[in-house]
Amino acid sequence: MLEPNVEFWKRVYAEFGMGDFVLHDRENLLIIYEVVRVSEATNERRAADLAKSEIQRLREQYEDILTALAQGKSPEELGPEGQRVAELWGCPCEPDLLRRAAGNVRVQQGLREKWDEGVQRARGLMPRIVSILRQHNVPVELAALPMVESTFNPRARSKAGAVGLWQFIRSTARSYLSVSRKRDDRHDPLRSTQAAARLLKHNYEALGSWPLAIVAYNHGKAGVQTARERVGSDAIEDIIVRYNGPRFGFASKNFYPEFLAALELLHPTIRQHAGQENSRKGS
């Protein structure tokens, strides 16, 4: 059920660059309407500036096509683009589905360059991260999570104030790390990995599964508990598809698929370092 989402994020990480803007459906990530390519972009912000007007034009175009289809117009009346959109959705479709789709056209910028930079940073950090995760008896596969959070950048800072490799916000970090004006251990790759391992293990013990523990790392343990109760299921697929809490938006719904995508791409590197550690222990 999550495979289309995972495949979408693998393409965002490994195929689409900063000059690529993917117009897609917010809920069904199999539906990609178009990829706008800005070849002359020299950096991420420049690419966004160059593509802004074209993206807005295309977004409105697809919204208009979907609305027209929902109102009963035939694909043929809407020309080649209308026919292509109808084929993407496998129409004839229910009007409600098409009206919903008209409000769900989203744009995702490619991340290939950021991913490549993250891979370079990960090479120096991965052996120590794997070792720390093992010390805390948590899955070494969690070593893929910093790629989703920060592309392995210890100096990363989000708009929400999350900091470091593992993107701790101040309130959460204070339970595990030293955070003050003089010293902020969120920037320390090793100390923050120790803290992340403890937090993830705590989430796992409270929620009973690693998929839920990983989502809780983004959405909070209480938020995941609420989602589980509302949906009436422990299955991560059910929660992602069926839960529509006010704070459980696109980013939260896709956090676990993004992790799985990063894990698939990074798995050989993680297993390599895990194997090297096993060899050292056995020697």
Annotate each PLM feature.
Residues 1-136:
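An acidic, Gly/Ser/Thr/Pro-rich helix-cap/linker signature
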Residues 3, 45, 49, 76, ...:
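Short, well-ordered helical secondary-structure segments
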Residues 9, 17, 29, 58, ...:
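A general marker of short, structured functional hotspots
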Residues 80-124, 135-136, 175, 179-183, ...:
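Extracytoplasmic and endomembrane cell-envelope/extracellular-matrix remodeling and assembly machinery
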Residues 100, 156-177, 233:
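Short, surface-exposed glycine/acidic/tryptophan-bearing loops
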Residues 126-128, 146, 167, 171, ...:
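A generic alpha-helix surface/boundary motif
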Residues 130, 134-168:
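Carboxylate/His-rich catalytic cores and anion/metal-binding grooves
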Residues 149, 169-173, 221:
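Short, small-residue-rich loop/turn micro-motifs
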